[in-house]
């Protein structure tokens, strides 16, 4: 489970790993799922561009190639869809990549895990990769918090905005001027602030930590 700031290369890095996995493992099924189907297709598009730029000796033959899925000669498939799509229900995946999972509605996230996760947990080498920027104290916060406390099996990975080349204090000040400090704290500091425009201030909500 990855908590990372905007424009830090998180999605591109995971997509590169998925491409490597599909090429060097036969008959695997990979799901690229996002809060919107178009976002998932865009990620698949990046993977397809990366594939086209591989050396010829690394490229598999292509069986299927379209905006929503691709299949290689080694029978490995990559499918792009929204987390709410009925198309992914009942399918068996070797890897599921959940992009910007914090932006999926809570009820859809719960429904997704109840219907799709059993197909993942049944395998010995299957993986779930969750990547997102925080968005309040929702299901992503709960998964992250539980992972930090060792209550689930996810391994936490985070990146500070200052680790991204070209981002320094001057960049931070300029970004805050152009947006707001609260927005910077969420999208770049990756803080789990409460929902915006609430009766209770986000700073107060932050002290009311989920711990059950």
Where are these regions (language model features)?
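Conserved H-loop
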Residues: 4-7, 35, 133-135
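Catalytic P-loop NTPase motifs of RecA-like helicase/translocase cores
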Residues: 8, 40, 88, 104-108, ...
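Walker A/P-loop
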Residues: 1-17
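Inter-Walker segment of RecA-like/P-loop motor cores
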Residues: 41-94
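ATPase catalytic-site recognition across NTP-hydrolyzing enzymes
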Residues: 111, 162-212
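Conserved SF1/SF2 helicase motif Ia
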Residues: 21-41
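ASCE P-loop NTPase helicase motor core
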Residues: 52-53, 59, 103-179
């Amino acid at each position: 489970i990855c908590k990372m700031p905007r424009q830090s290369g998180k999605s591109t890095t995971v997509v590169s790993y998925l491409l490597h996995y599909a090429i060097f493992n036969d008959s695997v099924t990979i799901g690229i799922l996002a809060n919107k189907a178009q976002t998932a297709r865009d990620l698949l598009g990046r993977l397809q561009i990366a594939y086209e730029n591989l050396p010829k000796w690394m490229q598999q033959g292509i069986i299927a190639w379209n905006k929503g899925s691709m299949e290689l000669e080694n029978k490995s498939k990559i499918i792009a869809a929204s987390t709410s799509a009925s198309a992914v229900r009942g399918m068996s995946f070797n890897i599921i990549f959940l992009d910007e999972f914090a932006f999926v509605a809570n009820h859809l996230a719960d429904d997704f895990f109840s219907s799709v996760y059993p197909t993942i947990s049944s395998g010995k080498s299957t993986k779930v990769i969750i990547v997102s920027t925080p968005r309040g104290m929702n299901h992503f916060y709960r998964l992250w918090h539980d992972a930090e406390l060792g209550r689930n099996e996810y391994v936490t990975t985070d990146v500070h905005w200052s680790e991204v080349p070209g981002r320094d204090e001057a960049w931070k000040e300029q970004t805050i001027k152009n947006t707001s400090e609260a927005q910077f704290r969420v999208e770049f500091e990756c803080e789990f602030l409460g929902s915006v425009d609430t009766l209770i201030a986000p700073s107060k909500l932050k002290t009311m930590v989920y711990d059950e």
